[in-house]
Amino acid sequence: ALVNEQAITHIQATPSHWQALLEDNAEAFTGVQPLVGGEALPMELARKMRKLGAPIINLYGPTETTIWSTMMTLDKLEGGTPAIGRPIWNTQVYVLGDDLQLLPNGAAGELYIGGEGLALGYHKRPDLTAERFIANPHGEGLLYKTGDLARWRDDGALEYLGRNDLQIKIRGFRVETEEIESQLIRCRGVRRAAELSLSNLTDERMQRAKMGQWWV
């Protein structure tokens, strides 16, 4: 009702949020331009969103690059993974190997981002800043080492492949699994803890920690 009352034309939300909106009342968002980011977009959800009528704008980018760094308009949904697109204006994106060399189309590597949107670093964290913001070996300025894995498709778009560490996204928020485990083992009577990230059909991250024979 609010969408119609306020004549809302564009809505930006995470995939988890979009899933909840469509489950509640999908018809209310017919004709609205959907923008999505903050998490990987599952193809099943993308198809549901596409039925609203307008092409989906799929956005990608970490906080360290002032949020959005690439975008892709998804009109025809083909294949298994929606692309995250091409760099936006004044942004450089590289897929690099372990030796920081450029990788060819189709080869998986780590995603590095440079350009005008790059942050200066982490507040009062010079060690982390030096680790994540590195000199650009292929141009001027710095690059942000995202920790995200990606590859270039033959059509020039980027495909997101996941993380190269144990970091996960829950409703758009970053979560380090080691931090969860370290807190769990501090609980009385807990000797070991293992954190699992389970994906259901909507790619919603459901967290469970198994301690002995119990799940909490």
Residue map of PLM features:
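Adenylate-forming
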Residues: 1-83, 90-92, 97-102, 127-128, ...
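AMP-dependent adenylate-forming
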Residues: 55-58, 73-216
